[in-house]
Amino acid sequence: MRGLTLSRPLSLDEHVYGLGEKAFDLDRRRGFFQLWNVDVGYVSRYGWYVDPMYVSVPFFMVFDTKNAVGYFVNSASRIFVDVGLFRYDRLTVFVPEESVELFVIGGPGIGDVLRRYFRLTGMPFLLPEWALGYQISRYSYYPQDRVLEVVKRHLDMGIPVSAVYLDIDYMDGYRVFTWDPQRFPRPGELAEKLHEMGVRLVTILNPVLRVDQRYPLFGEALGLLVETEKGEIYTGTMWPGKSAWIDFLKPEARRWWSGRVRDWAERWGVDGIWLDMNEPAVLGEPQRDCTIDPGALHEVGGRRVRHAEAHNYYSVFQAEATFRGLVEAGREPFVLSRAGSAGIQRYAAVWTADNAPSWDDLRLQTALVLGLSVSGVPYAGLDIGAFAGHRHYRSPHLNDLDLLVRYYQIALFFPIFRAHRAPDTPDREIYELPDRWREKALRVVRLRYRFLPYLSALVLEAHEEGRPLLRPLACYHQDDENVHAMYDEYYVGPYILYAPLLGREDRRPVYLPRGRWADFWSGRTYEGPIWIENADELPIYVKEGALIPLSAEGGLDFLLFGAGGRMKLRDGTVAEHRDGGLVLTSPKHINEVIRLGERVERIRVGASTDRVI
C-alpha cells in the first residue's frame, strides 16, 4: 500500500489522548485505530472496542507527568494509528497519501496543547444558551399536534424543555426541505406555538437529494453533486430511495445549501439543524463500509479529488454550510452533527449516536464524550436513555428504569443534554415514568438548569480561550499517575469534579486529587489526594477557590469555596471573589451567596448589586 508512515518512540510512562470518537479507554495506549467515519449500526455492532465510529479526528497528544506534545495530521483519508499495540515501544501512523501536513504542537501541559490545537484548526463556535437546556427528541414525533402535546405535557408537569426535534418522518417522502402535508399541514404555526411556550424547533437534514425530475431541488443542484469517475451523477440508496449526494467540498454547493437552510429557517421558524447520515452513509453497501465509493469524485479548488481522500472532512464542510445558512437567517446558529473530524468544533456539536441500552454502554458513553472533549470536540452528548430498540440489538435492558435514570445522571454536565429513542422503543418521556423514577430524572433536569449559568460561562471560555467544558483529571493533575486513564470522573470547568454512578449501586469510590474539596450537597471538606465514598446519587465536589454562578429566581446565586475564584459570565460580566467579598464588573440581581465549608452558609442578598461582602 502506497503512503507515508510516521513513527515515534513510546515510553512506558507515556499516555495518549485523542483521535476522536473511540470506543476505547481514555488512554489510547495498546490500541489500534482507523480514522474513517462510518455509520456504526450498519457496519458493525455498537459497543466497546468497535472501531471505527462516526467522528474521526487526526489529532492526538502524548504526555507524561511533566510534558505533553500534540500531533495533528491534516488528512481526510483512512488513517491507521498503532498506539503501542503491535510494537510496544512505538506509536505509528500510516497515511495513504504521498505527502501530508503534520503539525507538532508543544505543551508542556495537556491544556496548553488543546488551546494551541484550537488556534490551529479553529475555536469552538459559541453554543447558544438555549442549546444547553433539556432537548427532547424521538424517531419520530408526529403528527404536528402530537409534537405540541408532548411539549405541553412536559411543561405542565414542571419539566423544563429548551428544544424539540423532528426526525425524518416530518418530510414528504424523506425529501430534504419538505414537509409531509398530512402529518405537518401547518408547519409555520407549529414553530409559532412552540416559540410561545419558550421552546425551539430543530429539524433533521440528510446530505442527499432524491433523484427525481419532479423534485425541484434535484434540478437546482445539478452540477453540485458528487460524480462518478465517468462524470455521471453518483447515486446510491438512502431514505428517499435512489439518491444523489451533495458535493459539500465544492464552494458553489456549500453556498447553495446555505441558501436552502436560510430559506428553511426564515420561512418556517426553524431554530437549529440536526445533520444525520453524513459520514456519509449509503444504505446497502457493506462492501464499502456503507459509504460513498472511494473512487467517486469531488471538486476542490477546480481539481477533482477522489472520495477516499476527502471522506472524513465531508461532514465538516456540510456543517459549515449549514452553520452559515442559520447565520444568514439571523439565528444563533445551532448545528448537531453525527459525523465530524478536525474543524467540526467551529460549526457543530456532535452526539455519540445509535447506542443500545446496557450497563456496559453507560460506561462507554462517559468514555466517548470525555474522549471527544480531549480530541478537540468540546460540545458532545449522547441519546439519553439510549437509542436502539428491539430491531437493532434486542437489548434486554429496554425496560430497566434504573438504567434509564443513570443515563440522565451521567449526562448531567454533558454539553448536549438530549433524550432520543428509536421508533421500536417504549415511551420514556419523564412524565411517562412511575413516580420514583420520574422524580429521580426530574431532579437531574432541574439541577441541570440550576447549573446553566456556569455551563454557559464555560461555553464562552471554550469559544474565547479554547478550553473544553469537560476535562480529564490529568488536565490539572498531570503529575498524578492515578488519573491518566480515569474516565469515570472528570472536571466540569475548573471548579467542579463529577463522579457519576455507572452501576446499579448507589455508592462508589471517588478519587479526589491533590487540593481541598467540598461536597456540593453537605459542604463537608476533604484534603486530597484521598479516596472517599460518595454520599449522594449525584456525586459533585467543588474545588477550593471556586466561584460558581447558579440560576435563581429572577437572578443568580453564587457558590463560593475559599478565596480567589474568578468567572467571566456569558454577558461579559467578570465575577471575582477577593478581599473577603464577591465583586462584579457590572451589577447583577444576586439572590444568595452560598459559602461551602464544614457547613453550607447562605447569605441572602435579593438585590441588584456589584459587591457582596
For each feature predicted by the language model, list its residue ranges:
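Catalytic and substrate-binding clefts that recognize carbohydrates or anionic sugar/phosphate headgroups
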Residues: 1-128, 138-139, 144, 151-156, ...
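Extracellular structured ligand-interaction cores
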Residues: 54-58, 66-68, 76, 97-99, ...
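Aromatic- and carboxylate-enriched substrate-binding clefts and catalytic-loop regions
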Residues: 160-441, 476-477
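Short alpha-helical segments and helix-capping/turn motifs at coil-helix boundaries
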Residues: 38-47, 52-62, 118, 147-151, ...
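A short amphipathic beta-strand at an alpha->beta junction
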Residues: 600-612
